[in-house]
Amino acid sequence: MFLLVTYTIYSRVLTGDSRIPQSQDRQQSPTNDNNHEVYKVTKDGVYKQEVTGVVEEVEEEELKEVTTEDLYKSNVDIFDLNDYQGSQEGAKNGDILLFLMPLRNAEHVLPMAFYNLMNLTYDHRLIDIAFLVSDCSPDDTTLETVFEYSVALQNGTLVDKLKHEEELKNSGNVRGTSDLYQSYMEPSYIESVKKAYSNPESHHPNYRTPFRSVTIFKKDFGQVIGQGFSDRHAVKVQGIRRKLMGRARNWLTSAALKPYHSWVYWRDADIETCPGDVIEELMSHNYDVMVPNVWRPLPTFLGNEQPYDLNSWVESDAGLELAKTLNEDDVIVEGYAEYPTWRAHLAYIRDANGDPREVIDLDGVGGVSILARAKIFRQGVHFPAFTFLNHAETEAFGKMAKKMGFSVGGLPHYTIWHIYEPSEDDLKEIARLERKKRRQKS
C-alpha cells in the first residue's frame, strides 16, 4: 500500500547571510513552472521554503497506527467561502486582504514603495503581502533589498533604516544627472513629495505596525524588454510585454491566494504619492473590481502634469469596429495612434476639483492599482496571457470580469501619482536647457 505524502521544508536564510543566493546563481529557465523560490519573512529574518511532493512507501501495519479521524484533524482545513466574499467595510469586518506587488529591476524605487506600504491605513494585521521578483538584470539587487526591507518592516525598524540611508545619500552631496529634472518640476509638486516622505509617521498612528505576513517569490518568465521608459512604452513591444506580464500576474495570484483572502490589491512599486486610505476608499464602493485615476507629474516645459494610465477606459463603438478588422491574435494597445479607438479614458475624465467619490463603470482597467474581490479569481477571472477579445493582461482582465457578470469601476477624480520617468526626448530637452543656462551664466 502506498501513501502520498506532501511536506514542506523550511531552511533558515537570514538577511545578509552568505547562504542567500546571489544574482548570478538565480538565473532560471522561464519554461519550467516548478523552477521558483519562495521566502517567508519574520521579524527575525528570511526563511527559504521548498515545497516538495514525495511519494513514500508505507508498510500496511504503519497505517493502522493512524486513524482516519487523526488524519482528518491534522491535515484537513475547512473553509466556507461564503465567509470570504469581501465586504465594503472590510477592515471593520476583519476581511483579510492579499497585497500583490510585481518587481523587476526595482531597487531604485523600493524605499518609496515601502514607505507607501507603511502608509496604508487598512489594518496591517489584516494584510498578507506577496512580492514577485522576476527577470531582473544579473547585477540587480532587488531581491536582496526586498529581503532587508521586509525584515525591517516586520520588526518595526524600517523607518529608521530608510531615514539612515537617505541621510547617507544626502551627506555625499552628489547631485547626479538623473536628479536634474527636479529643477524643472513645479515647486508645488516638489513640496508635496517632501511632505509625503519627510515625517511619514505623522500620517497615522499604526505606521510601524507589522503586517500579517510577508512572502517573497522569485521566478523568471523570459521578459527581455528593457525597463527604461522608452523601452517599456514602445508600441511594437506592447503585445509581447503585456502577455508576459499576464503570465507573471496569474502565477503570483495562484501562488499567493489563500481560501481566507476576501480581497486582492495589486499595486505597482513606482507610485510616488497616494492617499493612505486608498484600499478603504476603493473597497467602499462595493464593486468587484475598482481602480483609481493615475496621473504623473511633468517638467514645467511639458505642462506640469499628464494622465499616466490610459488602460482604464469605457468601450466605444469605434473600438468595437476596430476589433472586427484585426486578426484574432492582434492586441489593441490603448493610448497609441496606431489604434484609434476613441474610447473615454478614466484619466481624461478627471477634474482636479471633482467629487472623489464619483464612480464610472469601466470595460478595461490599468494595472497600477487594482482592488478586486478574491472570489472573482476563484471563479476564473484572470489576466489573459493570450489575446482575449483583442486585448491582453489588465485590459483583458477588465473585459473578462465584465463578460462574467462582475462589476468593474473607476474613480475619475480620486488620483494617485506615478513617478516621473524622463523619456529620451525629455533628457535631450533638459540637456539643451542646461547648456542654455551655462551660456547665459558665462
Swiss-Prot record:
Biological process annotations from GO: cell wall mannoprotein biosynthetic process; neuron differentiation; protein N-linked glycosylation
Coiled-coil region: none
GO molecular function, one term: alpha-1,6-mannosyltransferase activity
Pfam families xref list: Anp1
GO CC terms in record: mannan polymerase complex
Family: Belongs to the ANP1/MMN9/VAN1 family.
Record-given protein name: Vanadate resistance protein
Organism of provenance: Candida albicans (Yeast)
